[in-house]
Each structure stands twice: as C-alpha cells, then as structure tokens.
C-alpha cells in the first residue's frame, strides 16, 4: 500500500477532496493555489489560480462541473472545473474556513471566521447552473450564538445544515430560516476540525482536537459510536464507503515534535472498525501532521493532505481489510 507522492504545493495542505466518480482529486493549500489530479496515476491535470491567501477549503459538485473554494483572502470563488475559469468571486469581511455543496448541487454553504469585530457567520448561496449571472447576496445568513462554527455540511435531502464548533458543539439548523433545531455540546470537549458526511448523508463523522472521533445521526445528532485515540489530536476523519471502517489522522503540531520520527509525533493514519470501535491498523504518514483525509467514493483508496506540503494517494490492496476487527491481543498492525 505504498502511496503515490504528489508534489504540486509549496506549503502545507489544508484540504483534499475527491469528485463523485473518484477519478479526480482536488487539493488546496496555504500557497494560495488549488490543484486537480488524476487519481489512477497521480498526474496533475491543472491548477486554479486567483486567490491571494491560504485556500482553506474546496468542494466540487456531483457532476464535476463546478468547484467552489474559500480562502483567507476573504473571498469565495466559483470555478468551472473543465477550463479553470473563475466564474464568480464573492467578498466577505473575514476569511472563509469551510465551503460545502448541497446534495442537489443548487446551493453552497460557507463558514466565515469570527475576527476583527466581525461575528462568525454561516451563509447559504443559491447557485445558477444555466450560465446566467450568479447572485451577489446570500439566500440565508445566520450567526451561531456562543462558540464560533468551524465546519459546515448539508444533511440528507438538504433539509438542514450541520455545523461543528470551536468548543466541540455540533448543531443542526433549519436551512430555510437559520433557526437552531438541535445541538449537542458535551460529546466533544475540543475544537471540531473536520465533519464528513456518509454517502447518503444520514450520518456523519467528526474529528476533534480532544483526540476523538464521533459518529452522529444526521437527523437527531445522537452519537452512534465513539472512537477515542489516547495519543493524537485529530485533524480529520473519513468513512470508507462499503466497508465498516473509518480513517482518522492528525498528530502533534510540527513545532512541538522534538524529532522527525512519524511515531514520535503520532503522524500515522489510524484505521478503526466503525461498529466495534476498535483500532485495527496504522498506516505510516508523512513527516508531519495529517491535515486532511479524503476517501475514494467507491472505497478503493484514500488521499492525505499533509503539513509537509505533499498529497499522498493510497490505493487499498486486498490485505488491507483482513485485520482482525476485535479481540486482538497485540498492538494494531502497522502497514507500509
């Protein structure tokens, strides 16, 4: 399971994202650019230039027609995937930390940062797909009370928005009114770093700086399963479609690690059994924390965006899922 090492960024990766078919991988970074790669061989297909700050988040629609990005230059941009043309740029008072397409590809949700006297906000824009002009004003704006939102996603059938917050809170919001429908505040006790939906959006997984990941029901926000890592502050967690496993990764901040050993910094990617809540294997990471994990939509492999500036493209082999899901007496096995 040796990865293909993709070198196309000069600074740390912030997010990696597959398209729906899994033949393309998008990566964004602190070097202001977005790259798109072929997943079967790791060849770079193109680059999207236009942002003037760290690109924090990227998402692509289900038809691979439009891509959206959010940046520290206080702008969100809509791109045509096939040509690299920027179709629209929206300006905001603060940085955009997360962008997310709706299930029906007609809306984009984004989270803006709380900074310089500006409240953190969640906005929803309706996207014109027929070639006409894009709206300047959002369909919905609301300011989460209390802890600021870090991540956002649409729930099943786009009925609600789900947000993860700085204090570990997870909340459900009415997509039409912006009213809070439900919230859970005690499950995570640290900043929520990532939130990824299942394929049908009926459940989702979160990762947190409190060294845990949680599996939630999208409708009720009830915690279905919990995965507590004793060592690693987590930056990302992702479910493997069609398999009862999830991947999670993170690591100590690079500057806090006294040696370059991946083991010393806990940079390995951990595979857990979703049902039994058991760690089954570890996969060697890079020379620094894992900042983002994305899994192929068909469960064929996964991609890692690292603090070291590389994208690592892994393809699962036939032995990957033969690890004992529970009852093992030894340490989880380590895969190359």
From Swiss-Prot:
This is Eukaryotic translation initiation factor 3 subunit I. The lineage of its organism: Eukaryota, Fungi, Dikarya, Basidiomycota, Pucciniomycotina. One of its GO terms (biological process) is formation of cytoplasmic translation initiation complex. GO terms for cellular component: eukaryotic 43S preinitiation complex; eukaryotic 48S preinitiation complex; eukaryotic translation initiation factor 3 complex, eIF3e; eukaryotic translation initiation factor 3 complex, eIF3m; nuclear periphery. Transmembrane segments: none annotated. PANTHER family: EUKARYOTIC TRANSLATION INITIATION FACTOR 3 SUBUNIT I (PTHR19877:SF1). The keyword Disulfide bond does not apply. SUPFAM superfamilies: WD40 repeat-like (SSF50978). It comes from the Eukaryota. It comes from Puccinia graminis f. sp. tritici (strain CRL 75-36-700-3 / race SCCL) (Black stem rust fungus). InterPro entries: eIF3i, WD40/YVTN_repeat-like_dom_sf, WD40_repeat_CS, WD40_repeat_dom_sf, WD40_rpt. It is found in: Cytoplasm. Pfam families: EIF3I (PF24805). Belongs to the eIF-3 subunit I family. Keywords: Cytoplasm, Initiation factor, Protein biosynthesis, Repeat, WD repeat. Component of the eukaryotic translation initiation factor 3 (eIF-3) complex. The gene is TIF34. Component of the eukaryotic translation initiation factor 3 (eIF-3) complex, which is involved in protein synthesis of a specialized repertoire of mRNAs and, together with other initiation factors, stimulates binding of mRNA and methionyl-tRNAi to the 40S ribosome. The eIF-3 complex specifically targets and initiates translation of a subset of mRNAs involved in cell proliferation. WD repeats lie at residues 8-49, 50-91, 93-135, 144-183, 187-226, 285-324. One of its GO terms (molecular function) is RNA binding. Its main location: cytoplasm.
